[in-house]
Amino acid sequence: MIKKIISCAVVAAVLTACSTVSMTGRKQLNLVSESEILSASLTEYQSYMKTAKVSTDANATAIVKNVAQRIAAAAEAYLTVTGQTADLQNYAWEFNLTQDDNLNAFCMPGGKIVVYSGMLKLIGNGADRDDELAAVIGHEVGHAIAKHGQERASQQLLQQMGGSVLGAVMGGASAQTQQAIATAYGMGTQYGALLPFSRKHELEADYIGIVLATIAGYDADAAITLWQKMEAASGGANPAPFMSTHPSSTKRISELQKAIPKVKAEYGNVSQPATTTATKTTTKKAATTSTKKGTGFKIG
């Protein structure tokens, strides 16, 4: 009876904790509260910034902040137009360039954006520099507004809940058998659910990123040249998709090539939203006249 109660509790928790990513329509699990994820991510961000070396290159920092402000403004405008104004209070935007040769960037839940200098070096100073940087930052902000961090934490929590149910079901088994099945269970959740979801997150963030970049006035095609550069920098050494938390560069480029024409058609004619300033915690709100054909989306 106890086993059934535990199992039903897990199922009930999952069924009542689903939400939707508005830009893609994908259903997602949401067992962790907004306040919990924001608090935890802020702690992680502050811990990182205590040890990170903030770039002293004023010109490079200004480039990052300019692009990040426009992407942040596009994100807030999108949330406003699509009726997600309650989420706006969760964003206290900060934009940083740190001295790190790794090809990386991130945006914490709550809008803490960090770009590594190695990413800027890869992008270079060509004509597409700002457009490619917008693809990077748009992707990272995409993770934030799609609440991927919250979803990942929920998946981990569900894994723990599932493990509790498994332990109850196996109550009469030997310790050795319990350990063997528990190990198999862990492998199954890692490679059968958690990693594929992470790859879905990456592709979804790619899509949201080009939408935000387009709204902000950047050329979404630069996302393709960005990933071509990333692929070249890796020497073509993409990890096996089954064992990777990230899709291959080839997969990402393929998905972007399919999505970009649709994104340009749907969002390419919106007027550019007002930008943020580095010292303000939220962006200025764009007007929300909803007249764009097909989506009801217009910013101006």
Where are the language model's segments positioned?
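A Zn2+-metalloprotease active-site environment signal
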Residues: 2-6, 10, 18-300
